[in-house]
UniProtKB/Swiss-Prot annotation:
<comment type="subunit">
    <text>Heptamer of 7 subunits arranged in a ring. Interacts with the chaperonin GroEL.</text>
</comment>
<protein>
    <recommendedName>
        <fullName>Co-chaperonin GroES</fullName>
    </recommendedName>
</protein>
<dbReference type="GO" id="GO:0051085">
    <property type="term" value="P:chaperone cofactor-dependent protein refolding"/>
</dbReference>
<keyword id="KW-0346">Stress response</keyword>
<dbReference type="GO" id="GO:0044183">
    <property type="term" value="F:protein folding chaperone"/>
</dbReference>
<dbReference type="InterPro" id="IPR037124">
    <property type="entry name" value="Chaperonin_GroES_sf"/>
</dbReference>
<dbReference type="GO" id="GO:0046872">
    <property type="term" value="F:metal ion binding"/>
</dbReference>
<dbReference type="GO" id="GO:0005524">
    <property type="term" value="F:ATP binding"/>
</dbReference>
<keyword id="KW-0963">Cytoplasm</keyword>
<dbReference type="GO" id="GO:0051082">
    <property type="term" value="F:unfolded protein binding"/>
</dbReference>
<dbReference type="GO" id="GO:0051087">
    <property type="term" value="F:protein-folding chaperone binding"/>
</dbReference>
<dbReference type="InterPro" id="IPR018369">
    <property type="entry name" value="Chaprnonin_Cpn10_CS"/>
</dbReference>
<keyword id="KW-0143">Chaperone</keyword>
<dbReference type="GO" id="GO:0005737">
    <property type="term" value="C:cytoplasm"/>
</dbReference>
<comment type="similarity">
    <text>Belongs to the GroES chaperonin family.</text>
</comment>
<comment type="function">
    <text>Together with the chaperonin GroEL, plays an essential role in assisting protein folding. The GroEL-GroES system forms a nano-cage that allows encapsulation of the non-native substrate proteins and provides a physical environment optimized to promote and accelerate protein folding. GroES binds to the apical surface of the GroEL ring, thereby capping the opening of the GroEL channel.</text>
</comment>
<dbReference type="InterPro" id="IPR020818">
    <property type="entry name" value="Chaperonin_GroES"/>
</dbReference>
Length: 102
C-alpha cells in the first residue's frame, strides 16, 4: 500500500482498488469557466492500494493488472466515493479501470 493509504488505514477488499482522482481544471486556457458537461467523461487517478484480489474457478489467485503508483483512466461516475480527513478517494473494481497510462 502507498504511504497515503497506510496512513488512512483504508484497505480495499476483493478485486477493488483505492484511487485518488487527479484534479481537473475548471477553466480553459483563455480563462473561460467550463461547465461540468464540457469536461472529460473519464478521469485520471493514482492507484493508492489494492484489495486481496479475485480468484478463478479453481481457487487460484488472479493478479491485478495495475500496481500501486500507476496512473489509470476510470469513468467519471464509476466506483464508490468516500471522503476521509477532507480528502476525496474512490474505490473502484478492477473491471472499472479503462486503461493504465504510461
Amino acid at each position: 500500500m502507498s504511504d497515503q493509504a497506510t496512513t488512512l488505514k483504508i484497505k480495499p477488499l476483493g478485486d477493488r482498488i483505492l484511487v485518488k482522482r487527479e484534479e481537473e481544471a475548471s477553466t480553459a486556457r483563455g480563462g473561460i469557466i467550463l461547465p461540468d458537461t464540457a469536461k472529460k467523461k473519464q478521469d485520471r487517478a493514482e492507484v493508492l492500494a489494492l484489495g486481496t484480489g479475485k480468484k478463478d474457478d479453481k481457487g487460484q489467485q488472479l493478479p491485478f493488472e495495475v500496481q500501486v503508483g500507476n496512473i489509470v483512466l476510470i469513468d467519471k461516475y464509476s466506483g464508490q466515493e468516500l471522503t476521509v480527513e477532507g480528502e476525496e478517494y474512490v474505490i473502484v473494481q478492477m473491471s472499472e479501470v479503462i486503461a493504465v497510462l504510461q
